[in-house]
C-alpha cells in the first residue's frame, strides 16, 4: 500500500487581532515612505478592546498623522460598529515613537565595507539593519508556486472578507480563521483535501445551520477545486458553536505574531523575523522577499520542483555571510551551481535588494493580510519571473 502523508496550514482574516496590528504598522510605514522614501521605520502595534498602542523607532523628517492612519486602517478592515467592542472612531490611539538608535543607524547608514574607503561601490553603503537568517521558498504545487495548504487557506479567508464587504452574507463580522489539511501521495504531490476548518465571527442572530451551509456553499466550494474534495473530506465550521465576540474584544493582537501565515504555512523553514512595520533596510523583510524571488525563479525555470533559499547577514555588513539553496532532491543541476548563479544574478546586499525590488515605495499595507508571498491579486516585485532566462543561462 502506498504511503500518504498529511500537511496542514492556516490563515487568518484581515480582522484577526494580530493582522489588525500588522496592517496598522504597515499603513504607518507606507504613510511615512510616501513622504520620505529614505525613512527608517520600525513600527510595532498592540490592539485590544477599545485601544491601540503604536510604539517603536522612526528616523524621518516627514510628518504623519498617526491617529488618522490608525483610524482609517481600522475602518477599511471593517471595524466601524461599536457593538464589535473595537471601532475606528471610538478606539483610543496611543502613539509612542522615538528616533532610531544612533548605534544601529551608524551601521545601517555606513556599512563595514565602506568605512574609510571612499572608492567603494555605492550599493555597499547600506549595512544590514540586524543580524539574522531569512528563507524563501517555492514549489510547483500551484500556479503561484506556493504550497497548496497555505494557498487554499488564504483564499478561504479572502473569500469570507469579500462576502462580508459586499453584503452577500450580511451577518459576517471581520474576524476569521481558516485551516486546510492536504493529503500528499508517495511522490509528495497533493491529491486531495482531507480537512477544512473555518471559524468566522458573526452577528448573534445567525444560526449555526445557516453559517455552516453558507460557508460550505459560498466559500469552500467556490475556492477549493472540486477535484480535491470527496465524500471523505471533513468540514469543521465554527466548531465551538458560537463566535460573536471576536477581534480585539476577544483577544489582544500584536504586530509580527503571524509570521507563518505571512510566508509558507510551515511548509518551509522560517528565520523568525517578522515583516510588518519595517522598512527595507531591515533584512528580516527585504531579504525574505529576495529569497522568495530567487526560489520562485528557480522553480519557474524548471531547475527544481521545489526550492528553499537561505540568506544570512551580520549587522552593519552589506554582503550576506551565507547563501544556501536546497532543492530537496528535485533539482536538475547541482545546488552549488544554483548558489553561484544566485550570487551572480541577484544583488543580495541590502541596498542592492532595495534597488532590485524598488522597495522604497509605499507598497507594504497591501501585503499585511492574506500573505506576503504568492499573491496573484496585487503586483509585487518579488513575485515576478524576470530572472528565469538568466538562471537557465547561468547554469548551462
Swiss-Prot record:
This is S-adenosylmethionine synthase. It comes from Streptococcus pneumoniae serotype 4 (strain ATCC BAA-334 / TIGR4). InterPro entries: ADOMET_SYNTHASE_CS (IPR022631), S-AdoMet_synt_C (IPR022630), S-AdoMet_synt_central (IPR022629), S-AdoMet_synt_N (IPR022628), S-AdoMet_synthetase (IPR002133), S-AdoMet_synthetase_sfam (IPR022636). Mg(2+) binds at residue 18. It is found in: Cytoplasm. Belongs to the AdoMet synthase family. Binds 2 divalent ions per subunit. Homotetramer; dimer of dimers. GO terms for molecular function: ATP binding; magnesium ion binding; methionine adenosyltransferase activity. Catalyzes the formation of S-adenosylmethionine (AdoMet) from methionine and ATP. The overall synthetic reaction is composed of two sequential steps, AdoMet formation and the subsequent tripolyphosphate hydrolysis which occurs prior to release of AdoMet from the enzyme. Its main location: cytoplasm. Pfam families: S-AdoMet_synt_C, S-AdoMet_synt_M, S-AdoMet_synt_N. SUPFAM superfamilies: S-adenosylmethionine synthetase. Residues 100-110 are annotated as: Flexible loop. ATP binds at residues 16, 175-177, 242-243, 251, 257-258, 274, 278. It comes from the Bacteria. K(+) binds at residue 44. It is an enzyme of class 2 (transferase). Its cofactor is Mg(2+); K(+). L-methionine binds at residues 57, 100, 251, 282. GO terms for cellular component: cytoplasm. The lineage of its organism: Bacteria, Bacillati, Bacillota, Bacilli, Lactobacillales. Its EC number is 2.5.1.6. Keywords: ATP-binding, Cytoplasm, Magnesium, Metal-binding, Nucleotide-binding, One-carbon metabolism, Potassium, Transferase.
Amino acid at each position: 500500500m502506498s504511503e500518504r502523508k498529511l500537511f496542514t496550514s492556516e490563515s487568518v482574516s484581515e480582522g484577526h487581532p494580530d493582522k489588525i496590528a500588522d496592517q496598522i504598522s504597515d499603513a504607518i510605514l507606507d504613510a511615512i515612505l510616501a513622504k520620505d522614501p529614505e525613512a527608517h521605520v520600525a513600527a510595532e502595534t498592540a490592539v485590544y478592546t477599545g485601544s491601540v498602542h503604536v510604539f517603536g523607532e522612526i528616523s524621518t523628517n516627514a510628518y504623519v498623522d498617526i491617529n488618522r492612519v490608525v483610524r482609517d486602517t481600522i475602518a477599511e478592515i471593517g471595524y466601524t460598529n461599536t457593538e464589535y467592542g473595537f471601532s475606528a472612531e471610538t478606539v483610543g490611539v496611543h502613539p509612542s515613537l522615538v528616533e532610531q538608535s544612533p548605534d544601529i543607524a551608524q551601521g545601517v547608514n555606513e556599512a563595514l565595507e565602506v568605512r574609510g574607503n571612499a572608492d567603494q561601490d555605492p550599493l555597499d553603503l547600506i549595512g544590514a539593519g540586524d543580524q539574522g537568517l531569512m528563507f524563501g521558498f517555492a514549489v510547483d504545487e500551484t500556479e503561484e508556486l506556493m504550497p497548496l495548504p497555505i494557498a487554499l487557506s488564504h483564499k478561504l479567508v479572502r473569500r469570507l472578507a469579500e462576502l462580508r464587504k459586499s453584503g452577500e452574507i450580511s451577518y459576517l463580522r471581520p474576524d476569521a480563521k481558516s485551516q486546510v489539511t492536504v493529503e500528499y501521495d508517495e511522490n509528495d504531490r497533493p491529491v486531495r483535501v482531507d480537512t477544512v476548518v473555518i471559524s468566522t465571527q458573526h452577528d448573534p442572530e445567525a444560526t449555526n445551520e445557516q453559517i455552516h451551509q453558507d460557508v460550505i456553499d459560498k466559500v469552500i466550494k467556490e475556492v477549493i477545486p472540486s477535484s480535491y474534495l470527496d465524500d471523505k473530506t471533513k468540514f469543521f465550521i465554527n466548531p465551538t458553536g458560537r463566535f460573536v465576540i471576536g477581534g480585539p474584544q476577544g483577544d489582544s493582537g500584536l504586530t509580527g505574531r503571524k509570521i507563518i501565515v505571512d510566508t509558507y504555512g510551515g511548509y518551509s523553514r522560517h528565520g523568525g523575523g517578522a515583516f510588518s512595520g519595517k522598512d527595507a533596510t531591515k533584512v528580516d523583510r527585504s531579504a525574505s522577499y529576495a529569497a522568495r524571488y530567487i526560489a520562485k525563479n528557480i522553480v519557474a525555470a524548471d531547475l527544481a520542483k521545489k526550492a528553499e533559499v537561505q540568506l544570512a547577514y551580520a549587522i552593519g555588513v552589506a554582503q550576506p555571510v551565507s547563501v544556501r539553496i536546497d532543492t530537496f532532491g528535485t533539482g536538475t543541476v547541482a545546488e552549488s551551481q544554483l548558489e553561484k548563479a544566485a550570487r551572480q544574478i541577484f544583488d543580495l546586499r541590502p541596498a542592492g535588494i532595495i534597488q532590485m525590488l524598488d522597495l522604497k515605495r509605499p507598497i507594504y499595507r497591501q501585503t499585511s493580510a492574506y500573505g506576503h508571498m504568492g499573491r496573484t491579486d496585487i503586483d509585487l516585485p518579488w513575485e515576478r519571473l524576470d530572472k528565469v532566462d538568466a538562471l537557465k543561462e547561468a547554469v548551462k
